[in-house]
Amino acid sequence: MVRPAEGALATTPVAHESHELFGGDSTTCIVSVDADANGRARVWRRLGEHVELSEHTFPNWFLATSLELLAHLPAERLSADWLRQQHGHIQVHEPLAVVDLETSGPADQDAYRYLVLTSNLAEIETTLLETASKREGEEAQTLAELRGLVLIWEPVEQFLTLTGRTYFKDMSFEALRRFQFDLETTGLDEGRDRIFMISMRDSTGWRASLDIGDLGEADLLRRFVELVIARDPDTLENHNIFGFDLSFLVRRAARLGVRLALGRDGSEPRLETDVFDNGERPEPFLRWRVVGREVIDTQHAVRRYGLAAPDMRRHGLKEAARYFGFASSDREYVPGAEIWATYRTDPDRVRRYAAHDVDEVDGLSRRLLPPIFELTRRLPRGYERVAADTGPGSLWELLMVRAYLHAGRAIAAPAPRLQRVGAPARSELFMSGLLGPCARAEASPLLPRVLVNGSIAATNDDLQVMPRSLGWLLHRSDDSAARLLATAAHAYLSSAGLFGDPHAALDASMLARHYVELLVRDLRAHGCTPIEIDAEQVVFGVPTWWTPEMERAVSESARTYLPAGVELEFRARYVALYARAPGTSITLAHDGSVTLVGPAFRAGRLERFGDRFMHRAAACLLQWDVVGLRAVFLETLSLLRGGGIDLNDLCVQVTLHKSPSQYRRGGTHEEPYEVLLVEDSELTAADADADYYVARLSGLYCQQFAQAFTREDFSRIFRIPPGSGPFEAADPSDFDDIRPIATSLV
């Protein structure tokens, strides 16, 4: 139930240790914000079973380096003192106002010295763009494209930054009302296929299922909307919710004339562009925005987790649930292509399958989203935006801008990005090939501590916001959100962001590498063989006499040279390790598990047959079983030539951003979509190009093991025999003289 607020929201200054990390306003329990370019904001707060709505006006704003493009417009001029006094309560009485921000020294012509406040952003934007086009030759379409002259953020972020509010203050993740739903459809084309079932549950334990056994499709969608309104969730969640469920739902509703009033104001979902960034690379996607509710894709959370967990090979819902161990023992599985046919003969089986789907989405949400919830408590960004984008710039930039506005300070231009040599490589390999018992140790948290202890900051961070904030974060080592922010600090400093300074970042990297090299020297003194430096981690071979007591001795020794607050932590121990390249290795743990680490082994880029081959081959290699390695190769070769591998296992998984009907309308030729359009054809593995896949096996997958053998021995193990197989088992005597090797690279 949504009820209007009886009065204005409290704006008491926040009592946390650092307003820079939590915002300067103490308003509690915000679960969603909607704001627009006309200076209107709506804020929803969860108060137990009820949701309170309050409406606000605020000036839209942007930062500018010059007022030249606005010189012909009348504007109220305000001081930095006024801004400091009004922070959190800012209102202007003229359509345009300019705050002269304080500078730390002589005025920098490239500094963002002006905070421009307006009650008519659309008109100001049009005027600015026209003037820029005439005077500067800038052909920008939006203010965001005038970077260097203007900095602007989207309206929700403007509202939160200006007011000092954040989501979720004094609220637990368990108090958030989360709603999971999953569609079952007759196919993937919303133009011709239908929704025949929707399974639902929420975080209170309520659950329901709708299907066309009782309703027509249009009535099914209407009833779904009624249930969402009645349950009034704060979040809508599913796995690949943007790539499939909401897109399909919106387009089927439009085709059937059903108003999909899922917003808390009765509005329908609207499409926006957004960016998914897990810290590896930004990836644009189309987001469906539901007013008053945050839309969360658990696939984003799984992909983010998978970047740091090389043993997570796939990011699908079922695979992730099995990985985390909450897939039910009686979990119902139905192959995707068979779901509609199964429903027609055994609808209860499909109902169980769909119910298990939403249970697993809830499990992923509970497992992976609490740190994002805690991050959102600190940042002037919406929960759904933080959940999709945890790139370093998204975490730090607005946080720092908020601190500078709170202080009424201008933001100087970033330091010029001049070429500077000597930056240490993130990963450095000392040995390649197969090595015996090994361990992995990490000096943690080294880079954040170096930044704090040395007060290392960007040249234009004259308020020292980053090192001061980092100091607070490092005292919260048990806080997962604090760790995420602290870990991202150096990456942001290295970036081309507003407070990026690659020279300062390089100074920190060089100092951190110095400490890691001291650790390498110490390990050698204790009889260990360094194999690789990987950022703040060192992988090393251990002597036969290595004991837990020796680990403790190395840890004690490390305290004498590592910075205060940095501890040496032993992360893992391995029976054997194959070092292929910097940042790329295969390990055998004491429990027998094999883990492939590094971009060359990223499962999403590999056919399943190749991924399976490498795991089996690696298990043989790491146990010095050359005969077994040859047998795995021959077996895989025989299956490929004989059409014995399932067609799905010959495919590379790709993410599609358009529906089949959208692709058809586009008139382009894109191979993944062409494959999708013939998915119903009777293709089998026998139709696959066997020679192509044999070449993939030999030229890609086998080559991953080349550093483990001499060139001659490698050729003998992976020699391709004539014929289609099956092939005779390898004679052990043929390989008696082959031994895996290790090679020193220094």
Question: Where do the protein language model's features map onto the residues?
Answer:
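The two-metal-ion catalytic cores of nucleic-acid processing enzymes
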Residues: 1-428, 432-439, 443-466, 470-480, ...
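Conserved catalytic core of nucleic-acid polymerases
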Residues: 153, 440-631, 635-642, 646
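C-terminal, non-catalytic extensions of nucleic-acid polymerases
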Residues: 555, 563-746
